[in-house]
Amino acid sequence: MLLGPLCFGQHHFEIKDGSQKYNAEIMAEECVDDGCRGKGSVVLFDKNGIKKQTFLSPDLIFYFKQNFKPSKGIMTITHEMLRDEPLYFGDFNFDGTEDIAVRNGNGGNYGSPSYDVYVFNSTKMQFVPSKELTELASGYQGMFGVDEKSKRLTTFAKSGPVYYTYEYEVVPGKGIVLVYEKIENHTHEIVKTTIKKKVNNKWVVKKTTE
């Protein structure tokens, strides 16, 4: 969710090492023990301190590493201090501009972290919601991986003893397209693996047993 009234934000943090272009100020509704959750906001500033945009989250969950306790006032935190990320920066659609993903709860596969994804619109000069990337970051096991070299996004999922790996390519004008799928079935002592690769718009399937 984008701009809205900030009637919460009892605990304030700032992250300066997450992006080359932006600093982020995080406000969380509730912080106890080693983590924060509840309604929250992420405010982006450029490196000169100019406010750029605000994002709201219904459940901005993040956890600190052991022996780190939040306190009152604005606290500077680094990614090395966190064991669960409230936000990610990266070029998620490979258009040369930095995008952002904001934690929206634990709506992923098996209760894993889920994120709202916003991509930078060079025409509007602001971040706009991406429905398909949000679905990719909310329906699997945590935030998707970004491979800048192959220009692919990777996600993982699990269903009982079966493990899934998916790779997507970002196609201009078409959005994200599934190009690779790996299924590992550990139901029995023998592991059955099925790999599907899209080659020249056709699926090539390989099955193995170990």
Regions found by a protein language model. Give the residues of each.
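Acidic/hydrophobic-patterned starts of short beta strands in beta-sheet-rich repeat architectures
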Residues: 24, 91-104, 148-155
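Acidic, small-residue rich beta-repeat scaffolds with periodic aromatic anchors
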Residues: 3, 7-51, 147-210
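Short, surface-exposed coil-to-beta transition loops
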Residues: 37-39, 85, 101, 111-115, ...
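Acidic, glycine/proline-rich Ca2+-coordinating loop motifs
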Residues: 59-61, 103-106, 110-116, 126-127, ...
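Beta-propeller blade termini
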Residues: 13-15, 27-28, 82-92, 139-151
